[in-house]
Amino acid sequence: MKTLLIFTLTLLCSGCLEDTAVTPINTINPDSVEYYGVAAANNAFAFDMYSKLVQLESREKNNILFSPYSVSAAMAICYEGTEGTAKEQISNVFYFPANNTVFKVRLKETNDKVYSGSDGYELENANAIWVQEEYPVKEEYIFNVKNYYRSEVTNLDFVEKPDESRDAINEWVEDKTDRKIKDIVPKGSITDDTRLILTNAIYFNGKWEHEFDKKMTSKKTFYPTKREEVSVDMMYISSNFNYSENLKAKIIELPYKGNDLSMYIVLPKGNNITEFENNFTVNEYTELKYNMESLGDVETSIPKFKFETKTELSDSLIEMGVADAFDLKLANFSGISEIRLLISRMIHQDFIDVQEEVTEAAASTTVFIGSVSSSKSKSREFKADLPFIFFIEDRRTDCILFMGKVEYPEYEGTGRFWSLPWNK
């Protein structure tokens, strides 16, 4: 799995945003972040962000995939240099503590755990800041992003050599994502006003602890809605997995080799994913997950799926409460430079590939700135032939690294849809 985020800070002379109604979402008390820690803050933001992406999905009818951990990590680099009300708003939406020292120390501790890795999988993280040559970035900011965020800092000539700069950044992105994300910085996006580009990349490639047997994969029917069917490649395995259920949903844990990371799949009962996800909270997810037990084999069927998504996050973040950072008059990144900066655009692009042996995914964000248990003797079934929500999580820290929804699974040659004249 690979995740990439790109943040571009652009100095603009005009084009301020209009006044925007701010609707912050408070899943946890931001004042309590220091008590909850980085994982609780990250996971609360994950569910807030998911609720916003659902609103976009309702208009475009797509699957959902994003990396809350990467979005938060990239925004944290911005937060390091943010002051005033812009800082307060980022703190509220991302649940960052007001104390920068506490935050960056805690974040570094968490990152060190998440990326300590093992021989059973590959999980890497990389940050980079690309700065316009001779642009006055504060030395303290450069020191902090290098030491606490493990960020590279490279000078480029955006003004005189925009194409060469674009090529250098795109090559870095492709290298960090195993060539899954290409041309993340499109032609014409680097202008005379571009001053900084911040990139964050996460790469994950892991094999299942219990691999699915390819011989058991067969064509089965998946029901995206009560009136639609699609033929999919359904994988099957019967093994001793952690599992639980309540009146609303089932959950199963599919660990990766090394047992540091797992995929959790939440399967709502019935076929009404919209109603379920509109009421599904981080606390309910945590309770459902922590009620899991390993009581014997679970007959598990999940579809192979492979898809890409690309989402403009700027409007969603503004609606969530990060408004000032996108407004030239109100943005305050004085911790980065004395020259006024703003975030003008933020794009998140993702890729995921789930098959019998491995999971691989990539995500990219570009910001332009200027329990019911069964007995042991009874076989349990987890048949994901309806839309489901999935998480890829670090078990050591409980941080959600990736979150998404599969409503229309497709995998190279599959995905033939037809409507039903009846309700399932």
Curated annotation (Swiss-Prot):
This is Uncharacterized serpin-like protein MA_2613/MA_2612. InterPro entries: Serpin_dom, Serpin_fam, Serpin_sf, Serpin_sf_1, Serpin_sf_2. The record marks 372-373 as: Reactive bond. Keywords: Protease inhibitor, Serine protease inhibitor. Belongs to the serpin family. It comes from the Archaea. Pfam families: Serpin (PF00079). GO terms for molecular function: serine-type endopeptidase inhibitor activity. One of its GO terms (cellular component) is extracellular space. The keyword DNA repair does not apply. It comes from Methanosarcina acetivorans (strain ATCC 35395 / DSM 2834 / JCM 12185 / C2A).
